[in-house]
């Protein structure tokens, strides 16, 4: 078991940005896509673990229940609506319906089973309770694709962002930095650097029209964004050209204007125009229907700072000194021949990765150009280290990417530097040794925490290396593709 000196770390609960082109019905109100402020995409699992915060939440919930009793009593009374227009009556009825089912997104399959998914029932995805034994598309590729963009609310206009323009890239960075996913207690917000955004959004095959922005007509201010990038995905025995949808973000002041659903439908339309009809995506909420469920684990590298910013806390019978001793790491890696990846290593890293991923059911299929893009080291973005043996052969590699978070409202600490396990391939070096060295390298580079999902073979080292389990799941989804679900150990895909 993970040590008690750190509690489970909560995952944020983003709702999901994905391909949602309406079947002539438009975007219907439903419990899983109603809260527009949740419409931001996050895979990081970075959130504080703080008992006092949980207690405050419980107190708030009690107060809400007390207030709610008045509302419940009024709902029992017959409401006179004869003087209201029909549209207004429908809005009130929808609001009452949403209130009754609870507006928060479902975090577990049990919660999800009690929800109605009116919108998702119209989409080419399996139903939540459906047992899938077949493989293939839910619906055939579309021939008749809408040619004109979807209509935005008055005063807003579409803009394909040119991220090669440093000014435009800075605008996107600012939008995300000020409005993107926060944790449940509003203590941390993801801080994607401009350079990281270029890495994540411009892999080989990227298209400018898939960097889909929304601007205010009068001021040209960027107030919304969604993106797609191409990806060849191997799912069981099939290789399929898909997209990954990411970075759905709407300015906080516009979240009542229903901009997010239009963004989602528009990126879907643009992807369909390129002849792609499947997508892969992840979310911290349960929707119809996950193909796999993974959990984030967190390894303290700088326990004092993590405790000071309330990312974690001291448990009973643990002092700060004992906690720091518990998480102390060697000064240097122990694997002989471990060095940063170089350009000459691209072919062998490609070969090692391709062979290694064959044992999993959901994986990327990369060519050498893509391997260079995703793995060649870039400072403060992606780190890859290879193991070269005495004969000059590269036999193993480890990799992790950088995603800091802004720490809000703390007097001294402004940023939390997190490393995220990417792909780690072993043939000669034991995976436990490889990942122990990954922790040492991350600590040497100034990271505060090292995060990893329990996918692939990661479960074999998480507890042994003193990772603590997070308390939220990351769901993997496929759009317009049916296949049996799989355990986390068969998921071989890591999304930024």
From Swiss-Prot:
Region Disordered: start-end pairs: 1-82
Subcellular location: Cytoplasm; Cytoplasm, Cytosol; Membrane
Sequence ranges of Basic residues compositional bias: 55-66
Pfam families: NMT, NMT_C
Positions contributing to tetradecanoyl-CoA binding: 118-120, 247-250, 256, 258-260
Residue(s) carrying Phosphoserine: 31, 47, 83
Organs and tissues of expression: Ubiquitous.
GO cellular component: cytoplasm; cytosol; plasma membrane
Keywords linked to the UniProt accession: Acyltransferase, Cytoplasm, Membrane, Phosphoprotein, Transferase
Domain of life: Eukaryota
PROSITE patterns: NMT_1, NMT_2
GO molecular function, one term: peptidyl-lysine N6-myristoyltransferase activity
Changes seen on gene knockout: Complete embryonic lethality. Embryos die between 3.5 and 7.5 dpc.
Family: Belongs to the NMT family.
Protein name as annotated: Glycylpeptide N-tetradecanoyltransferase 1
Species of origin: Mus musculus
Organism ancestry: Eukaryota, Metazoa, Chordata, Craniata, Vertebrata
Gene: Nmt1
């Amino acid at each position: 078991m993970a040590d008690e000196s750190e509690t489970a770390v909560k995952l944020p609960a983003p709702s999901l940005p994905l391909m949602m082109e309406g079947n002539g019905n438009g975007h219907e109100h439903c419990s899983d896509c109603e809260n527009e402020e949740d419409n931001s995409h996050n895979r990081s699992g970075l959130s504080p673990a703080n008992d006092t915060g949980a207690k405050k939440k419980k107190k708030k919930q009690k107060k809400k229940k007390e207030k709610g009793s008045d509302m419940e009593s009024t709902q029992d009374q017959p409401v006179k609506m004869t003087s209201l227009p029909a549209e207004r009556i429908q809005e009130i009825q929808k609001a009452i319906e949403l209130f009754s089912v609870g507006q928060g997104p479902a975090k577990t399959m049990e919660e999800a089973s009690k929800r109605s998914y009116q919108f998702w029932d119209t989409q080419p995805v399996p139903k939540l309770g459906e047992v899938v034994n077949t493989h293939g598309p839910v619906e055939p590729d579309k021939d008749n694709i809408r040619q004109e963009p979807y209509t935005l609310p008055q005063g807003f206009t579409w803009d394909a962002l040119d991220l090669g323009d440093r000014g435009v890239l800075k605008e996107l960075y600012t939008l995300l930095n000020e409005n993107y996913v926060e944790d449940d207690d509003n203590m941390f917000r993801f801080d994607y650097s401009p350079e990281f955004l270029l890495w994540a959004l411009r892999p080989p095959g990227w298209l400018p029209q898939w960097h889909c922005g929304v601007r205010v007509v009068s001021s040209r201010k960027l107030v919304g964004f969604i993106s797609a990038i191409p990806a060849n995905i191997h799912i069981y025995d099939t290789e399929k050209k898909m997209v990954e949808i990411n970075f759905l973000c709407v300015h906080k002041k516009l979240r009542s204007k229903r901009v997010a659903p239009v963004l989602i439908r528009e990126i879907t339309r643009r992807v369909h125009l390129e002849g792609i009809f499947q997508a892969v995506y992840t979310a911290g909420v349960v929707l119809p229907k996950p193909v796999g469920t993974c959990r984030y684990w967190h390894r303290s590298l700088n326990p004092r700072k993590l405790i000071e910013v309330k990312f974690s806390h001291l448990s009973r019978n643990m002092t700060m000194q004992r906690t720091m001793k518990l998480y102390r790491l060697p000064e240097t890696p122990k694997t002989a021949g471990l060095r940063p990846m170089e350009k000459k290593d691209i072919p062998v890293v490609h070969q090692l990765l391709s062979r290694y991923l064959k044992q999993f059911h959901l994986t990327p299929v990369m060519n050498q150009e893509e391997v260079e893009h995703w793995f060649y080291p870039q400072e403060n973005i992606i780190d890859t280290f290879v193991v070269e043996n005495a004969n000059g052969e590269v036999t193993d590699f480890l990799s992790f990417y950088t995603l800091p978070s802004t720490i809000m409202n703390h007097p001294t600490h402004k940023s939390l530097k997190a490393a995220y396990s990417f792909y780690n391939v072993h043939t000669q070096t034991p995976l436990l040794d490889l990942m122990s060295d990954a922790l040492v390298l991350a600590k040497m580079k100034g990271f505060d925490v090292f995060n990893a999902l329990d996918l692939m073979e990661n479960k074999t080292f998480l507890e042994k290396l003193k990772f603590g389990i997070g308390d939220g799941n990351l769901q993997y989804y496929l759009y317009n593709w049916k296949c049996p679900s799989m355990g986390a150990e068969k998921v071989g895909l890591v999304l930024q």
